[in-house]
């Protein structure tokens, strides 16, 4: 249904945001070294 589609999209967006945040942290850490 519509609600499960919304939840799935939200989960995918959250995972993508977490990956992007993790990559940004790694980039900042490597530049700080």
UniProtKB/Swiss-Prot annotation:
UniProt keyword Secreted present: yes
GO cellular component labels: extracellular region
UniProt-listed InterPro entries: Dermaseptin_dom
Subcellular localization: Secreted
Keywords: Amidation, Amphibian defense peptide, Antimicrobial, Secreted
Lineage: superkingdom: Eukaryota
UniProt modified residues of type Leucine amide: 33
Entry keyword Secreted: yes
GO biological process, one term: defense response
Disulfide bonds: none
Tissue-specific expression: Expressed by the skin glands.
Family: Belongs to the frog skin active peptide (FSAP) family. Dermaseptin subfamily.
Biological function: Has antimicrobial activity.
Protein name: Dermaseptin-H6
Species per Swiss-Prot/TrEMBL record: Pithecopus hypochondrialis
């Amino acid at each position: 249904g519509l609600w499960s589609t919304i939840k799935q999209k939200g989960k995918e967006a959250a995972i993508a945001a977490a990956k992007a945040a993790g990559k940004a942290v790694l980039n900042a850490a490597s530049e700080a070294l």
